[in-house]
Amino acid sequence: MTWRDNQSFPQPTLNTTGIPSVPVDLSSFSELLSRQAPELLPVNRVAYGTTPVGPTDAVPHGTTIVALKYPGGVLIAGDRRSTQGNMIAGRDVQKVYITDDYTATGIAGTAAIAVEFARLYAVELEHYEKLEGVPLTFRGKVNRLAIMVRGNLGAALQGFVALPLLVGYDLDDPHPEGAGRIVSFDAAGGWNIEEEGYQSVGSGSIFAKSSMKKLYSQVSDADSALKVAVEALYDAADDDSATGGPDLVRGIYPTAVTIGAEGAEEVPETRIAELAREVIESRSRTDTFGPDARRGIDARGDS
């Protein structure tokens, strides 16, 4: 790393006031920002001093994010709804971001902090590559994001939680077919590389993950992974009011990004819309209410 005093490790030095100071890691944009303009960090947008509380309804929250690995790559997708308490705060929120050529993030939780997390992380990766002349390894990218999440712990204890889901393609993996990576984080900055092949975060994650568990055997390429992701988000929206499903009336659909050996690429909205219509049509043909409910409908003459 590039330290201000050109040493391998930061050593305390005396500043002009005679007080020991620690050199700044210039390759880390977030650390540089914390020294030069700390008020711009997402964590410092929250006023401290209050007692810890649960997740707050005072600001919009975004959910749900899903990710799946497929042979030769990985896919991440997210719904578009944000909620504020029991109200819908937004219907077309962008929750999935490409952060560099081979990584993308989707963040659930407090919307304002989550969006700034994603943007700051993208700048962090670009800043490192410009200063060092080489991109971070995938493990290095994970550690950088973990440090940023850990820095938000104080706000998280006040209810302003923002949890990312990181996906990427590991260029150092000797087996390209299995180079897709999914990494989940907790509020304290702990992280875990998912080995099952799929993961989800957000209020609808339990429903989305259950759906992916049943459908994951159908994943054979990027397109089949996208279909499973749309199915999972549809299932999450069916049971979680904070998750928005495909909105055919307004033309609002989930967003998705695929990452393979060629790099990260946003999935065209037209393809997602096509799959969403297929899922809705398939679900509409299926009797999901049981024979008793069907007999009741027929008796009323509603069929």
Curated annotation (Swiss-Prot):
Predominant subcellular localization, coarse grouping: cytoplasm
Protein role: Component of the proteasome core, a large protease complex with broad specificity involved in protein degradation. The M.smegmatis proteasome is able to cleave oligopeptides after hydrophobic residues, thus displaying chymotrypsin-like activity. In complex with the ATPase Mpa, degrades protein targets conjugated to a prokaryotic ubiquitin-like protein (Pup). Among the identified substrates of the M.smegmatis proteasome are the pupylated SodA and Ino1 proteins.
Keyword presence, GTP-binding: no
Full protein name: Proteasome subunit beta
Biological source species: Mycolicibacterium smegmatis (strain ATCC 700084 / mc(2)155)
EC number: 3.4.25.1
Keywords per UniProt: Autocatalytic cleavage, Cytoplasm, Hydrolase, Protease, Proteasome, Threonine protease, Zymogen
Propeptide: 1-62
CDD domains for this protein: proteasome_protease_HslV
